[in-house]
Every structure is written in structure tokens, then in C-alpha cells.
Amino acid sequence: MEKGTEALNSKVDKFQRATPNTVLVDSILLPSKLKLALTTLIFVIVLLIGLGNPGGILAQEASEDSGLEDALSGFDDEASADEDDALSGFDDGTDESGSAEDTDATEEEASWKQAFSGFSGSTGFSASYSFAKEAPADATQADWSGLTKLRPYFSLTWDAKLGENWKTRISGKAFYDFAYGMKDRETFSEEVLSELEKEAELREFYLEGSPFGSLDIKLGKQIVAWGVANSLRVVDVLNPTDSREFGMTDLEDVRLPIAMTKLDYYLGDFKLEAVAVHQIEFNKSPPFGSDYNPSTQVITEVIQESSSENTEYGLALIGTFSGWDASLHWAQYYDDSAHFKITKITVIPGVGAVPTLEQRHSRLTMGGATLSIPSGNFLWKAEAAKLQGMEFALVTDKTFARTDALVGTEYSGWSDTSLTLEFGVQHINDFDVTLEASPDSQLEDRIATTVSFMQDYINQTLHLSMFGMMIGKSGQDGGLNRMSLEYDVMDAFSVTGGVMLYQTGDNAYFQSLNENDRLFFDARYSF
């Protein structure tokens, strides 16, 4: 099956696509000194807020006691026995009828309450404003400056128990973006309007239960998150991701649920996990014409059919021990990130050889392991994996293997604060320098470093989140930075605002994001 999709001038690897909330490096469009001063000023203001006396939050709990009075019984003692006998039959019938009706009504009310108690969700709207990009001089071109998103959204989840050992979940989400209608809508590509203007989709939809004590089974659309890393992906290969707005979403929110069968067998300190992925679905990439897609042409993406022959498989042995955890992982799957394949070359006079490209997905085999060790206020973690079967456009006579490794730590010794550092490297074994040229644009070693800082203020109602990622030993291949503040107006209502800055570098894709710096805002009501 073929699907029309966009081609990126430079493929962004999984280290770059699995990016969460971010922030603190300079973008290119504003002068670096000004950006550094702006970021520092914001950070200092937030810290001053945190050092002040926190405000108090009063919580009130109310309870009501209600009861039913016993029905008054007894009639006039002076009434004749005949009257009592005659009336007693009607009284008994009335009591039985009333009692049955009350019981049925109570059971029906309890049933409705139980059904609706499983519903949860959120609604709100999100907005973003691109302050670095200028409006195009040509009015026929899409305008990605200024307001780029004004999106009301709604999500709903239903959880229900089915007997003692089974439960189900059904969730979905929908949005509509008014920003395109507020500009010249016809200047945006069909792909952008189709994928970014509106969406309604079913997300998680599964049945989960335990046929007997040591075995759990989960059937349906679900997410299986492997690994111990927060922001970089090594052994976490089963679920595709949504990277249409690169870097704007946390890793836990960016995974896409797909149809799987998962079996978990428990034996002492170990869990053996077996997964069969029935639905072949790949990453949601920025559509052609998006400000996150610099491609000038649409390139066909070849997508494998969801069939028994193309089923993906995964195995994991997870051990939870006293003082440390470890796991072993194996998977045979299709790479969620596409590679280019040259299908033909056309020689154009005065231009030269012009290749015709397709996007393909390689069948990969992964073997890996993870380790996490808590030590005081630190949590040390590591992941490593070897991927085999990688294909590229410029070297077609063999496949390649790649070794991925990650080390990181989380520190939680400060009150209401967490700090996370992660360092990852991808090494292509037996590297061929031919792969450095376009369209492959590969490096023998690709390094990524991430820093995440989160802190709560004012009785945990104000939440600061900062994230920074750099690609390359010193960020020479690009990076991104994001800072946000979330305030809980009340228990169920929160507002969030922040700034996103992209750092350019030698990588062509990050160079294309140079003018994508933006402010963002979100208001959310949860129920």
C-alpha cells in the first residue's frame, strides 16, 4: 500500500524525534546575547517567586448524612377486626409493590452511577504564536508567521470493570484548528489541512484481564513502553510517535497506540512479556507544506499492509529485585522512521542527474537490555541495543547494523524538584562515508544530550518545566529548548504558557527550523 507523504531534506533519527518538553538554548533569528538575557531574566523571576512565602490553599470537605425514616405503622386499635383484615390485604400489596419499585430504582441508579463513574477526560484549547518567522512576500504562499494554532480540543476515556478479573478502556480525542481559517486557507497544502486542521481518532481501545493468577492478557489498541529513559529512545521501539510538531510534546504523550496482543507471565521477581503487533503504522511526520517540513516535493511512502506475514514481535524479560531492576529485550519490527530509496535517475540537461525517491521502512531486529539502580537521591539508569537490517539509498548492496547506548541519572534530593540528565549515542557499524551525502545524510556517530528540570512552587500549584536537547558533542548538529509554566487555577482547571526555541547547526533539518521559535499557551479543564 502506498501513501503520499513528505520528504525531509535530512532524516531526523529517533534521538531527535523522541523529544519531550524542552528549553534553554538560543535560536538563530534573535541575537544570542538578547536571547540569553531573556531566558536568564525569566528564570530568575521564576526562582524569586519560588523563594517567596508560598500562599496557602484551603481545602474544604463537606459530607452529608442522610437516612430514611421507618414507615409509621399501626391503625386505630378500636377499629373492628373485620376492617383490619380487609385493609391488611391492600396494605400488604401496597408495601410489596413500593418495596420492589424502590429496589429497582435504587439498583438502576447505582448501575448508572457505576457506568458514568468510569468516564474521565479533558477539554480546552491550545494556541501558538510564531514570533521569528515573517509573512511571505508572495501572497500565494502559506503564511506560518504570527498565530499558527488556535485549537479547541476534547478527549474522553471510559474505564470499566468486567467481572472480577477483567477490565476495558476506550479513549478518543478530537480537535479543530481555527488558525487556518483566520488566514488565507487556500494557500495551505491539502496535506496540511487534512492532517493539522482537524482530527478525530480512537486512541486506546483494549480488553485486559487475568485468566489465572500468574498470567495477564491485553488485547487491542495499546501502548507498550519499554526502557527506563525519559526522553531518548533505545529499546522503546514498538509504538510509533507523533512528531508533526517536533519537540512540542512529551515522550509519554507522543506515543501512538496500535493494535497488539500482549501476554505477561509472572514468576517470582521476573515478568516475561510477549507482544504481537498486528497493526502496521508508522510515525506521524510533519505533512508536506508544514512549517516543520522543509521538503519542496511530495515523496511516496510505501507502507506495508497489516497482515499475518508482516506481524511485528517483541519479547521482554523484566526483573525487579531488591535495590535494582534490569530487563532484556528482543523485537522484530518495521522501522517507524523511513529511509530513502532511489527508484530511478533522470538526467535533465543543464541540471544533471535528478533521482526519484521513495520512502521505505526496513524490517529490523533489535536485541537490548536496560538497568536502573537507585542510590540515595539518585536513580542511575542505562540502556543498550543493537539494531540489524538498516537500509539506505546510496549503499544498496548490503544492510547495516547500529549500536545504541544511553546512560542517565535522575536527582530528587531537592524539595518539589527533579533534575534529569541523559546522554545517548548511535553508532553505525562498518560505516560507509558514502552515507554522509544526501539523501541519506548519516553520521557514523550521532550524539544527543538532554537536560530536564522541573520544580513546583506556591504549594505545588505553579509548575516550572525546562528541557534542553543538543545534538552532537557540543550541539553543532542542532538542538531545541523549551520552558513552560503551568498554574493550577483550581483542582480541575490549569493554564500553561511557555516559549520554544530551536538551535540551528550543521544538520539541515534543524537549519530549516531556525525560524520556528514560538510562544505557546494551553488552558485545560479535566473531569
Language model region names:
Residues 125-133, 174-178, 223-225, 267-269, ...:
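Transmembrane beta-strands of outer-membrane beta-barrel pores
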